[in-house]
């Protein structure tokens, strides 16, 4: 629509009145001064200020922006020239952008309908493609050698708001037929770039393809964002005629002509915290069973796998990312992998992460390629120019990437994610494009063994079939086995039967992951935090008794807790925790040879040291502490030991604590009189007292020592598929891994107890497994 000069002048006066009325506040006049001082050429006008000045003007700007963009630019240009006449060259103008609330004109790419064509909208989404920045001619100057004169011509395309579009053909002769020579140095150009914006993955409709909108940015807005950025773009939604080669077509291509691009926070969809929420979070963080509580609250429909659930909680919390002054980047995100038999709920755990994590993208090994996970260089179908398209890991920046069926991925595609998992960047050097994109995300993968089911006669590395270069990039690697235990099978069957029998009061089915929401409005504060106990859903927890009614958090509160701890708590390492981490890492390295031969899942490398730091920091976040303490390191070692050895090494913790206590006591006694050095631990430091102490305590072995003995023996028998073993070999094996050594009489005493329980049979110094 071509607006006449009178209307243009009236619109310009309206914007001049708006800027003049601002003199008392000085907001926009100061903004114009800053713009002139910083040599910028765009002024951002807030819609709130425009509404306060004139509600009718704000509505007209949104409904018919083509009529008001040029007058607004002319008004700001006039004010800028009055402040500094030398600021703008002849023919230059100050551009105008808009920001602020747009009401129902604040939409996503899926909500852009034909009713928005010709109006100003604010579209939020994630940038998936960026074209190269190209110059667009605005004014051409031509020299005529015959007459010595010059001829200039201006160009406007369909995206311009001033006048009608002009042709794009350069004049080669003047009106008299004389040849013209183009003076390229005197021509005027402006930068031009096209973007593709997609709706954010977490808000896209399930089962539908994400919608995309093309965006045109010009002048100072080019290169203001890159693929993977979450942006909010304000612009005019226009319909461009299709390239039909002369035929009449009713199909139009829609684009968004941007006038303001602003980067959004990664946590734009962050939950809202109330004062009561913060109070309850602090109360939960002070509980002794916070780790178990969060682990049980994650995917309550999955029976068991408590240690894996705890590890998933730490993965969603993450460590602390560090960027040193020398350019070194220290990864803070935790990567995790699950390998095991089919039907052990690996994929269900990935779905639980998708439901809880603020930003999570799911993909599969067979349904994704290397460039689909990282980034790709594509060609634009219309212009033929190269574009950089972001992959799943770039789109999941500051989030979690869930990769199912990881073993089905090709080796070449799997190598593509090596850089992402450690350096957390995607570097592209193809087709004349060299770029580095951020991919700061955690990776949680699930895979089946190379033989379909886990072969216990082979080492974990041979079962997994993945190279060490990739395995070492995973902080945690869990072997999930389908155990043939009648008691466990009975408990699982009861749990699954309760899941299928569970229904609401009206007889309808109910989502298991959203229990507790219906009780949030009944006035009870606990109802909004803990899932209301249901015998059919939760069963009876014999270990916890009465506490079983409030041992699971609602999904809504769990999301709030994880988001709060992940983003607002940044713990730092203390000296005590650093020393404990160094000591623990040295012990893991010393036991590396035994781990490889005895069933260790991961190679113990320098990355394992960083894994301990990340897990400890994540545990400190979970406890809402700003310092990483020794208890956090011990909790991290529990998770790491379970991942490496597939058992709870409580005796390792006891050994570490006792060694630290013995070292501190020895240092203390070195400076004092050594008469009463170890009265309370006479059996540990003086070798002359070992036999005497053991002689009096052979028949009184503590229960925890008996359990540790049985655990070590059972693990050794299972790992080596033994049906009989000598007592001498048992004594050597147990003492090699135990926190404190067992003498011969204690070994025989524990074995006799196991024989009385019909678990083993002893004959002629040989123990036969029943």
UniProtKB/Swiss-Prot annotation:
CDD domains with a match to the protein in the record: MCM3
Cellular component, GO, one term: nucleus
Record flagged with keyword DNA-binding: yes
InterPro entries for this protein: AAA+_ATPase, MCM, Mcm3, MCM_CS, MCM_dom, MCM_lid, MCM_N, MCM_OB
Motif (Arginine finger): 472-475
Biased segments, Basic and acidic residues type: 653-670
GO molecular function, one term: helicase activity
Region (Disordered), start-end ranges: 653-698
Chief site of localization: nucleus
Keywords recorded for this protein, A-Z: ATP-binding, Cell cycle, DNA replication, DNA-binding, Helicase, Hydrolase, Nucleotide-binding, Nucleus
Record flagged with keyword S-adenosyl-L-methionine: no
Domain (MCM): residue spans on this chain: 290-496
Catalytic activity entry: ATP + H2O = ADP + phosphate + H(+)
Quaternary structure and interacting proteins, as annotated: Component of the minichromosome maintenance (MCM) complex, a heterotetramer composed of MCM2, MCM3, MCM4, MCM5, MCM6 and MCM7.
Purpose: Probable component of the MCM2-7 complex (MCM complex) that may function as a DNA helicase and which is essential to undergo a single round of replication initiation and elongation per cell cycle in eukaryotic cells.
Family the entry assigns: Belongs to the MCM family.
Name this protein carries in UniProt: DNA replication licensing factor MCM3
Taxon lineage: Eukaryota, Viridiplantae, Streptophyta, Embryophyta, Tracheophyta
Gene that this polypeptide is encoded by: MCM3
């Amino acid at each position: 629509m071509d607006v006449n000069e009178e209307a243009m002048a009236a619109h310009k006066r309206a914007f001049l009145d708006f800027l003049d009325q601002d003199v008392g506040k000085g907001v926009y006049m100061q903004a114009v001064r800053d713009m002139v001082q910083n040599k910028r050429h765009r002024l951002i006008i807030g819609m709130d200020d425009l509404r306060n000045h004139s509600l009718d003007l704000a509505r007209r700007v949104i409904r018919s922006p083509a009529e008001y963009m040029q007058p607004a630019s002319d008004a700001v240009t006039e004010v800028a020239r009055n402040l500094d006449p030398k600021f703008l060259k002849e023919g230059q103008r100050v551009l105008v952008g808009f920001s602020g609330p747009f009401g129902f004109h604040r939409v996503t790419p899926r909500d852009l309908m034909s009713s928005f064509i010709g109006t100003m909208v604010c579209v939020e989404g994630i940038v998936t493609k960026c074209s190269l920045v190209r110059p667009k001619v605005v004014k051409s100057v031509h020299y005529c050698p015959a007459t010595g004169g010059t001829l200039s011509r201006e160009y406007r395309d369909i995206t311009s708001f001033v006048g009608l579009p002009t042709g794009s053909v350069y004049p080669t002769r003047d009106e008299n037929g004389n040849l013209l020579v183009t003076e390229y140095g005197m021509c005027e150009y402006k930068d031009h770039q096209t973007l593709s914006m997609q709706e954010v993955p977490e808000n896209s409709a399930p089962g539908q393809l994400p919608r995309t909108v093309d965006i045109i940015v010009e002048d100072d807005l080019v290169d203001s964002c890159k693929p993977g950025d979450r942006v909010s773009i304000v612009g005019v939604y226009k319909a461009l005629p299709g390239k039909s080669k002369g035929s009449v077509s009713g199909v139009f291509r829609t684009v968004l002509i941007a006038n303001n691009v602003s980067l959004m926070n990664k946590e734009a969809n962050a939950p809202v915290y109330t004062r009561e929420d913060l109070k309850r979070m602090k109360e939960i963080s002070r509980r002794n069973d916070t780790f178990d509580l969060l682990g049980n609250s994650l995917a309550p429909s999955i029976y068991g796998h408590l240690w894996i659930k705890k590890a998933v909680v730490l993965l969603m919390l993450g460590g602390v990312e560090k960027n040193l002054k020398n350019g070194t980047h220290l990864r803070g995100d935790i990567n995790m992998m699950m390998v095991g038999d089919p039907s052990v709920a690996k994929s269900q755990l990935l779905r639980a992460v998708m439901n809880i994590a603020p930003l999570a993208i799911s993909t599969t090994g067979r349904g994704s390629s290397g460039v689909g996970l990282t980034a790709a260089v594509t060609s634009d179908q219309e212009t033929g120019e190269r574009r950089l398209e972001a992959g799943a890991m770039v789109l999941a920046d500051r989030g979690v990437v869930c990769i199912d069926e990881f073993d089905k991925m090709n080796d070449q595609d799997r190598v593509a994610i090596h850089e992402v998992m450690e350096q957390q960047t995607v570097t592209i050097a193809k087709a004349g494009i060299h770029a580095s994109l951020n991919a700061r995300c955690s990776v949680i993968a699930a895979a089946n063994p190379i033989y379909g089911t886990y072969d216990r006669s082979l080492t974990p590395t041979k079962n997994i079939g993945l190279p060490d270069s990739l395995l070492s990039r995973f902080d945690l690697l869990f072997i999930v086995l389908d155990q043939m235990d009648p008691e466990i099978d009975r408990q699982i069957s009861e749990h699954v039967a309760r899941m299928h029998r569970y229904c609401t009061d009206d007889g309808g089915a109910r989502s298991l992951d959203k229990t507790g929401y219906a009780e949030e409005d009944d006035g009870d504060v606990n109802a909004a935090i803990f899932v209301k106990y249901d015998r059919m859903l939760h069963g009876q927890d014999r270990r916890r008794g009465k506490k079983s009614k409030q041992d699971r958090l609602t999904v809504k509160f769990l999301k709030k807790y994880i988001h709060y701890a992940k983003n607002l708590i940044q713990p730092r390492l203390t000296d005590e925790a650093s020393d404990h981490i160094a000591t623990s890492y040295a012990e893991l390295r010393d036991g590396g040879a035994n781990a490889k031969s005895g069933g260790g899942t991961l190679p113990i490398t320098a990355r394992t040291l960083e894994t301990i730091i990340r897990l400890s920091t994540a545990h400190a976040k979970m406890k809402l502490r700003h310092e990483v303490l020794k208890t956090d390191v011990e909790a991290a070692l529990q998770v790491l030991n379970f991942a490496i050895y597939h058992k709870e090494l409580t005796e390792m913790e006891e050994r570490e604590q006792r060694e630290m206590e013995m070292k501190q006591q020895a240092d203390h006694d070195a400076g004092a009189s050594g008469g009463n050095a170890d009265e309370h631990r006479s059996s540990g430091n003086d070798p002359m007292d070992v036999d005497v102490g053991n002689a009096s305590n052979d028949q009184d072995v503590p229960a925890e020592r008996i359990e540790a003995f049985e655990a070590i023996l059972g693990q050794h028998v299972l790992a080596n598929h033994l049906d009989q073993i000598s007592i001498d070999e048992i004594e050597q094996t147990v003492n090699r891994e135990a926190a404190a050594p067992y003498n011969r009489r204690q070994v025989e005493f524990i074995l006799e107890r196991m024989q009385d329980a019909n678990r083993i049979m002893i004959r002629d110094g040989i123990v036969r497994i029943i």
